[in-house]
């Protein structure tokens, strides 16, 4: 009886994390990449560029993400959120010099961040297993696919000039 109880306590793989061995390796890689590359680059970026410039760059990319949030809000039937995102984009793109200045926040127009992973969840797509993505960190299979779609539909990805596209991608990551 004791022998059977001991065997009964042996655990198999966690059903919510069937990719655990791979996830652990990717997490170790991400930790190393963060320590060796990403953090030093971010520190230099912070030391070289004044706060106002960094804020403007962040606002610019935030304005671009508001465009996709608008479409995802519509797809999730969140019409009020879609309207607010449309107002944010209109105000920040025109009055905010292409989004560099975030007037919409100053005007108390709430940001409603929605992505394609959330849209798939809204329409009943299950999350799938937990996965750790290189450089991006923890996610689910559904949200990983959503991240791929978000990236492919990103405004910057539509640029033909590879150097400009790569520069904007690098700036967004910092």
Per-region residue spans from a language model:
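A structured, mid-to-C-terminal "fold-capping" secondary-structure block
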Residues: 20, 118, 123-174
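Mid-length scaffold segments of soluble, non-membrane domains
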Residues: 63-141
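Helix-boundary and loop/linker segments of multi-pass membrane transporters
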Residues: 12-13, 74
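Post-signal peptide N-terminal segment of mature Sec-exported envelope proteins
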Residues: 14-44
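Signal peptide-directed extracytoplasmic domains
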Residues: 36-73, 93, 98
């Amino acid at each position: 009886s004791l022998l059977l109880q001991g065997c009964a306590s042996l655990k198999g793989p966690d059903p919510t994390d069937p990719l655990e061995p791979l996830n652990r390796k990717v997490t170790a890689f991400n930790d190393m990449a963060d320590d060796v590359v990403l953090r030093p680059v971010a520190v230099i970026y912070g030391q070289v560029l004044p706060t106002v410039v960094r804020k403007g760059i962040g606002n610019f990319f935030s304005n671009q993400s508001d465009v996709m949030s608008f479409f995802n809000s519509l797809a999730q039937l969140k019409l009020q959120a879609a309207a607010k995102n449309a107002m944010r984009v209109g105000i920040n793109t025109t009055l905010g010099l292409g989004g560099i200045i975030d007037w919409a926040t100053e005007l108390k127009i709430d940001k409603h961040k929605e992505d394609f992973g959330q849209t798939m969840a809204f329409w009943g797509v299950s999350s799938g297993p937990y996965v750790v993505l290189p450089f991006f960190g923890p996610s689910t299979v559904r949200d990983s696919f959503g991240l791929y779609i978000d990236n492919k539909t990103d405004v910057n990805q539509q640029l033909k000039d590879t150097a400009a596209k790569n520069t904007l991608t690098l700036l967004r990551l910092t």
